[in-house]
Amino acid sequence: MAVANTLISGKINAEVTVVTQSPHYFSGPSRPLLLTKEQTLDRIVRGYEEAIRKGVKVVVGTAFSIDPANRKVRYVGGYTSSGGVGELAYDYLVLAPGVVLDGSGITGYDKYRHNVLNVYDPGRVHLLRSKIWSAERGTIVVYAPKAPYRCAPAPTETALLIDSVLRHRGVRDKFKIVHIDANDKTQPPVIADVVSQIYSRQGIELVTNQEIVEIGEREVVTKSGERYKYDVLAMLEPNRAPKFVEEAGLGKTWIDVRSPQDLRHPKYDDVLAVGDAAGLPFPKNQEIAFESALFAANKILEMEGSSYRASVQYAFVGWAYVGNPEGRLESLSVRFGLDFTSQPPKPSKDPEPKRDYTLAKDNWEQSYLANLFGYS
């Protein structure tokens, strides 16, 4: 939508079509707060109706094939469509398919996928919330795969918000929380020391440099052979671009781009990639996705001879939820930032958890949604 809005603002003489799997958009940054019931779906879901009113053509369907040599995209119609297979021709193709959660490399994943919960989709987060609000005792395992993955702080946010819920219910002493991380430290690294200190105070066990390679009915196994029992498994699978990207020769794990500022594919001037699926040397989060979309739109405007440009640079301030040590359902957050306009990138942080940062994150997300979709 950021690309579409920018192209319309630039008054480009073209039909702008958005192909989306769902007739609604589910915002990501505050999804973890669904666990504590501080957030509700109605505040973070938006439809495309106002975009259509502005002149964007919205096609609800799932893209499954790209033919870059002949400028064709094939898709199967979705919820608000005939449900048939369709084909779109393009002059420019901007790929923003997001990521797929690929557990295919984990033994037992297909058999025990029903045990895998996380905060990344409505069904799984709802079931995870149900379990942590009803269970009386047990072991909760939280897992983060190798970076990069979507929303770097989400696994630590998950662990700390679960901790808050259990404290609120008065049953924290009956649970063990274990965070297994495939990286050498929790993500993002800029606040890893802060998270480690909070984990220590809250009694959350942290295991780093351990990839989960096998899932059983009540146990996970790491690459080194360590076994961890679980009653609840809050696990994020490894992230990658959808398979049709590789099949089209546009990349393997991620979509190939020329540079962060020039998001065209190395082989095709008319194919650009933005968001989490783009092969960028940055964290995968909503702000970087938005900024990459503006760079891509600017490149199309440049190629079309338009003088309009959206103001953009790769830099952001973010907030990571760290729960509430007193068990109140009023989550605190720590603030961090990364400025990629300097090399090496300049990090910043305030290690002191504050309620105001949680409110700032909410205000930012609501403003983002209003600007993107045209209504609050």
What are these model-predicted stretches?
Residues 1-57, 146-189:
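Beta1-alpha1 glycine-rich phosphate/pyrophosphate-binding loop at the start
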Residues 15, 139-141, 176, 270:
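Residues that mark the start of a beta-strand
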Residues 57-157, 164-170, 234:
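FAD-binding core/adjacent interface of flavoenzyme oxidoreductases
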Residues 111-136, 227-292, 302:
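FAD-site-proximal beta/loop scaffold in flavoenzymes
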Residues 147-171, 256, 264-273, 291-299, ...:
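Active-site substrate-recognition segment that forms the wall
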